[in-house]
Amino acid sequence: MADVMRVAVAGASGYAGGEILRLLLGHPAYAQGRLTIGAVTAAASAGSPLGEHHPHLTPLAQRVLEPTDAAVLAGHDVVFLALPHGHSAALADQLGADTLIVDCGADFRLTDAAAWERFYGAPHAGSWPYGLPELPGARERLRGARRIAVPGCYPTAALLALLPAMAEDLIEPAVTVVAVSGTSGAGRAAKTDLLGSEVIGSARAYNIAGAHRHTPEIAQGLAAVSGRDVTVSFTPVLIPTSRGILATCTARTTAPLSALRAAYEKTYDAEPFIYLMPEGQLPRTGAVIGSNAAHIAVAVDEAAGVLVAIAAIDNLVKGTAGAAVQSMNLALGWPETQGLSVIGVAP
């Protein structure tokens, strides 16, 4: 391992790329000179100062965005790819095997080629170790890895909400997920339906009835921990806020709340970024904004025989950039909590 890790961020003009840079600037390795920020790249925005896109990143404001190509990214020890799906695979193929590549896009998340091709309409590029350390066995796969696929934001919330119950076989393998999200999850590209006048004061479901691309990713993660095929009904809802996901997940159960809470406590007791809320308290997105934390609550609707598991995360931190930095830390043999906070910004 190099004495000083040189890090590049591709897609630095976008929300995820900017959030990765924010976290790197606060990383102790950056403060100690063990990590330096090299190339910051973009596509259409190449040639413009980073500060035009992220004025809050004042230490890097005068950096000029370079084109996103392999020649610019070569020579870095770590490369974060914060690119639209379909763009990461070609770049990754051109970078050295010793380069740690952390992909925040969808290209390498799914193990099922048919599912990838159905939902993304392109050939499957393969799969990489999945960057959700809280999943069973994930840390072992991430330590020393040189290729990492960061999970999608919705799957992160849904998997963290359901993992303990599914792993302990306390719920049926058919789950319903209704998740509300802020608009930053849709990216920074200009879109009519994301204009302020369209979003403010309105909530809107989209890609319903199994159409959302995160549906097979949620099913894949739950199947991996349960050893069973799992069906997922997923409804995403856009709400008028910039950040945050609140996922409400339900599944049939005959287990009492005491058994369910015991499973969640056993699973998450030692997890640094998971906060299992006391009975009677419920997660809210405002409590996790800016942090890598996930706040989780569980309850049982006894009349319906249903587990209700709720998770709140910041979609740009635990849902993307925070998971990327957490995975980088593990891959480099650093404490996984470095540069990441469990403390949100409120109100």
Swiss-Prot record:
Biological process GO terms, please?
Answer: L-arginine biosynthetic process
| Pathway linked to the protein | Amino-acid biosynthesis; L-arginine biosynthesis; N(2)-acetyl-L-ornithine from L-glutamate: step 3/4
Can the keyword Cytoplasm be found in this entry's annotation? yes
Per UniProt, subcellular location reads as: Cytoplasm
Look up keyword Lyase and say if it applies.
no
InterPro entries of this UniProt entry?
AGPR_AS (IPR023013), AGPR_type-1 (IPR000706), NAD(P)-bd_dom_sf (IPR036291), NAGSA_dehydrogenase (IPR050085), Semialdehyde_DH_NAD-bd (IPR000534)
- Give the main localization category: cytoplasm
- Do you know which CDD domains this protein is assigned to? AGPR_1_actinobacAGPR_like (cd24148), AGPR_1_C (cd23934)
Any one GO MF term held by the record is: N-acetyl-gamma-glutamyl-phosphate reductase activity
Its family remark reads: Belongs to the NAGSA dehydrogenase family. Type 1 subfamily.
User: What is the stated purpose of this protein?
Assistant: Catalyzes the NADPH-dependent reduction of N-acetyl-5-glutamyl phosphate to yield N-acetyl-L-glutamate 5-semialdehyde.
Q: What is this protein called?
A: N-acetyl-gamma-glutamyl-phosphate reductase
